[in-house]
Amino acid sequence: MSYLVLARKYRPRNFSEMVGQDHVVQALSNALTTQRLHHAYLFTGTRGVGKTTVSRILAKSLNCQGADGQGGITATPCGVCQACTDIDSGRFVDYTELDAASNRGVDEVQALLEQAVYKPVQGRFKVFMIDEVHMLTNTAFNAMLKTLEEPPDYLKFVLATTDPQKVPVTVLSRCLQFNLRPMAPETIREHLVQVLGQESVDSDPQSLRLLARAARGSMRDALSLTDQAIAFGAGALTEATVRTMLGSVDRSYVFRLIEALALGDGRTVVQTVDTLRLNGLNAASTLEEMSTVLQRMAVLQTMGSAAADGDDDSDAEAADTARLAALLPADETQLLYSICLHGRGDLGLAPDEYAALTMVLLRLLAFKPTGSGTTQMGAAPLAEKKL
């Protein structure tokens, strides 16, 4: 039997299995329960947050026949009737998915709309799902406007896009819009714990935190990375194997760099960059991790201990962040954060990314406000020399 990747194996089959999109689930469930159904829905959000999944669950809810064949429109599709199983397997003739990224012309849209005049063959409703709808041409959008505004009673449109700003306002005004949010790292981590428990895969908490951060709000990306990590770690997930696979920088290096900058210790800064080079760790990832830590330090300096609520850091990382927040003045934290952000853009312009990283960090040191009368190398500041 062929292996089924985790992202497909654990794709939600009903609204109760959806993770991190409670606002969308509640709105659609209430609409289905009261049968106040719109004729066109637009789901927006970044990749891997559930737009296509919600579309399929909605199609099942509209066409579910019930386990006994006597069911109607429901917010809890049975999952076992002919309509539900056919939609799950992609065989339901009344549910059509069109990928607008590869079928973006007016001819493809007109071919789809020609089917709108025919009543459903198997279910109660025809459902036309157009994915990445923002990729359609202007002519294609214009061709579908009339049908989108006044479709037959048996037809529902579901549009999905990662870039709603590119969808014409004439289309937006005809749709009921739902924004699927990027998922918090803690939400992703909790779901990975459940998935790995069902897969009987051993893991440690820090490895899951790394995967959740790397997913950047996308559950599909998190499951794909988990698949890769299981293969890389020979069936087990540890912090070391996941960090190596992702090429991410150990926070201990980041804390060492920020502490050295706070103390004006240029020698430690250069030595730490040399260590990063020897270990093959990415310079851009180093600045990204530094920006993340500096942002959390700034929030701690403003809000105190209450700022830790909702962070996905381990206890040790949170303690180090708090220690550095107390060590570095708030204005210097802001300066370091700003230079780190701008420094990431400099990396691609330099012949050697580690040399560029060194220069960015030394720039942080050079522009660091100081009340001392000497620089790191013991020379008098320029202003004093002029005097």
Label each region the model flagged:
Residues 1-177:
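P-loop/Walker A NTP-binding region and its immediately flanking N-terminal helices
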Residues 76, 382-387:
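Short, intrinsically disordered, charge-balanced linker/junction segments flanking boundaries
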Residues 82-93, 108-114, 124, 150, ...:
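Extended, largely alpha-helical regulatory/partner-binding modules appended to the mid-to-C-terminal parts
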